[in-house]
Design a protein with these regions (language model features):
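Hydrophobic pocket/interface hotspot
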Residues: 31, 43-44, 51, 67, ...
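Generic recognition of short, well-ordered alpha-helical segments
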Residues: 65-66, 113
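Positively charged n-region of N-terminal signal peptides that target proteins for export
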Residues: 1-4, 19
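A short gly/proline-enriched turn/hairpin at secondary-structure junctions
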Residues: 51-62, 73-80
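A mature extracytoplasmic/lumenal domain signature
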Residues: 47, 57, 87, 94, ...
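Short, low-complexity N-terminal intrinsically disordered segments enriched in polar/charged residues
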Residues: 8, 13-45, 65, 139-153
């Protein structure tokens, strides 16, 4: 009897996990699509009020409403920015109420990495923290460092 109960719990857990992974993938794809189509409501609605966005520049660290203010000129256009996900890995806490991910993106800046943390709030996943980073190939790091030195002068 205990084996049957355990097996049932195991199967149920895998189904729930698979559903959450699918929901998060869809949510993040919609979030990127919202930026590409300048859909402010969907883009910022995905983040809670205390959500954080870290961009590629060292000055780009915003709470959701600060990002909304900064990016208004971009969302006033037909497309704010267009990042296309290439791949994504999603991980879950034991309680299944926190998830984190990393993703590889195709962007106007070349390949970028995004990473983030989502929290399930009132049954819905919200993007609490997102970090965008430009991926610099290792063999170009010295050239990259030279560019940084020039920009600091």
């Amino acid at each position: 009897m205990n084996k049957i109960v355990f097996l049932g719990i195991l199967i149920f857990s895998n189904v729930v996990f698979g559903q959450d992974e699918k929901v998060i993938n869809e949510l993040m794809n919609q979030w990127h699509h919202a930026a590409a189509t300048a859909d402010e409501v969907t883009f910022f609605g995905t983040m809670p009020e205390d959500g954080i966005y870290i961009g590629t520049d060292t000055t780009e660290l915003w709470k959701r409403d600060e990002l909304k203010e900064w990016s208004k000129k971009y969302f006033d256009r037909e497309s704010a920015w267009a990042f296309t996900p290439i791949s994504r890995n999603i991980y879950f806490s034991k309680g299944q109420n926190v998830a984190w991910f990393d993703e590889l993106l195709d962007t106007w800046m070349g390949k970028c990495r995004g990473s983030g943390v989502l929290e399930k709030q009132k049954g819905k996943w919200k993007l609490k923290h997102y970090h965008l980073a430009i991926a610099v190939p290792n063999d170009l790091v010295e050239d990259y460092l030279e560019l940084l030195k020039k920009s600091e002068k």
